[in-house]
Design a protein with these regions (language model features):
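Intrinsically disordered, low-complexity serine/proline/glycine/threonine-rich regulatory regions
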Residues: 12-14
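C-terminal motif of bacterial Sec signal peptides marking the signal peptidase cleavage site
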Residues: 18-21
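Sequence-level preference for short, compositionally simple segments enriched
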Residues: 30-422
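Bacterial N-terminal signal peptides that target proteins for export
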Residues: 2-10
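Bacterial signal peptide processing site
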Residues: 23-25
Length: 422
């Protein structure tokens, strides 16, 4: 027997099995092929640079002497302070979420107030005002979809139409905690209500916690492909936690701002938000605004049923003097269509804006544009330009990650067909 021939055959068979196993491994399970510095259209961080973009960095305070925010898991009490559900159901204290929020705020307690919500569909807006104490709202269903909060609101409707839609039967009245929020919007004299007043769920509460809920702007595909900002969830508070929540809509689905009680963006306030184990769906600028937001183990899905054109996941309006905007880690990006959607664009609300976002250690599917994953800026139309820097003789990338001459949209260690650098 020819031993060497048998050995060669065994080796060939083993090598073939290895190649077959590798080729059958799904792209999202293969190691990342992203290498720094990337390209001007798709800049990639080095391992050393990526160390600057972690939860701890994003949750640092504006005051350099203040400790960073270190959120722990949401802990729920055995007995909530309020229960929302059908009249007559056991333990129910309120039949509407807004009534429970009003009751929690009027307690004037510095202690966190817990509002449990029984499974069901709750049509209408929810406004959570600024207050000394924080609010936790959570669904009692087995899944997030068991509790649905929703309404169809379009930024393009006039204030009169909006007022009748949002405030049936005097839901918001003078003397009630959230009146100032409603009143600020109803007094608008513009032709349309605008994005700032288009949210179904709007909170200005510091320390807000949301868990096991579905929040949706149901405007959906009932409008054309034009500008129809329709916010499902808007948050203006600091130290906000969102866990196991479905946030559904189309344009500007999830809107984060640093606005105060006057409902205008501020230049001296930082809001921080942690989103975990959640699902966000939309088409144009589905996650937008000004604030430091970390998304961990979250699914982002871009749909094209309304626009039939390019969609954008992120639209950060980060101030140029702040280093951190949006961070997505251990997450999944899925888009309908073939290579049409884009990961994001800067929302240039003024000349002092340069949106910042990092997507790292995540999976991006084939629905995203590999040649141009980042789009030109909204409003200003500033062309996207990534900073590739220079490479020294030790193969270290040298560049200023906050250079105002470039965009601040980065990736690191992503996988999947859509993560390919071309």
């Amino acid at each position: 027997m020819n031993i060497s021939r048998i050995s060669r055959l065994a080796l060939a068979l083993a090598f073939g099995v290895t190649l077959s196993a590798c080729s059958s491994t799904p792209p999202d399970q293969q190691p990342s092929e992203q290498v720094a510095p990337g390209t001007a259209s798709r800049p990639i961080l080095s391992a050393a640079e990526a160390k600057n973009f972690t939860r701890a960095h994003y949750f640092s305070a504006m005051d350099p002497n203040a400790a960073p925010w270190t959120p722990s898991s949401i802990n729920l009490p055995k007995q909530p302070d309020f229960v929302v559900g059908p009249a007559g159901a056991q333990g129910v204290t309120h039949t509407s979420i807004q009534a429970a929020v009003d009751a929690a705020i009027t307690k004037h307690s510095a202690s966190r107030q817990y509002i449990a919500i029984l499974p069901g569909e709750y049509e209408g807006t929810v406004y959570v005002p600024a207050a000394p104490g924080s609010i936790t709202l959570y669904g009692l269903g087995e899944k997030a979809v068991d509790v649905k909060i929703g309404l169809a609101i379009d930024s393009e409707i006039d204030s009169t139409t909006w007022r009748h839609l949002v405030n049936p039967a005097g839901k918001y009245m003078p003397g009630k905690p959230a009146w100032y929020m409603f009143d600020n919007c109803q007094r608008k004299r513009a032709a349309t209500i605008g994005v700032m007043c288009s949210a179904v769920f709007w909170s200005q509460n510091n320390g807000l916690q949301l868990q096991n809920l579905t929040i949706q702007n149901t405007l959906g595909d009932s409008v054309d492909a034009g500008n129809h900002q329709a916010v499902a969830l808007r948050s203006d508070g600091d130290k906000v936690q969102i866990n196991n929540v479905n946030i559904l809509g189309r344009q500007n689905t999830f809107f984060v701002t640093n606005s105060g009680v006057q409902n205008t963006l501020q230049n001296n306030r930082l809001t921080r938000t942690l989103v975990t184990n959640s699902y966000i769906e939309g088409d144009v600028d589905m996650v937008s605004g000004r604030g430091a937001v970390v998304f961990d183990n979250t699914d982002f899905r871009v749909v094209n049923s309304r626009t039939q054109q390019e969609g954008y996941v992120f639209a950060p309006a980060t101030q140029s003097n702040l280093f951190y905007g949006f961070l997505a880690v251990n997450s999944r990006f899925t888009a309908a269509g073939d290579g049409v959607a884009q990961l994001g664009r800067s929302l240039d609300v003024d000349s002092a804006t340069n949106g910042q976002v990092v997507i790292r250690d995540s999976v991006i599917n084939e629905g995203f544009n590999m040649a141009k994953p980042w789009a030109d800026a909204a409003i200003s139309k500033r062309p996207f330009s990534g900073n590739t820097g220079t490479v020294d003789d030790k193969d270290n990338v040298q560049r200023n990650l906050n250079d105002a001459n470039f965009n601040r949209m980065w990736e690191y260690n992503n996988r999947g067909v859509g993560s390919t650098v071309v």
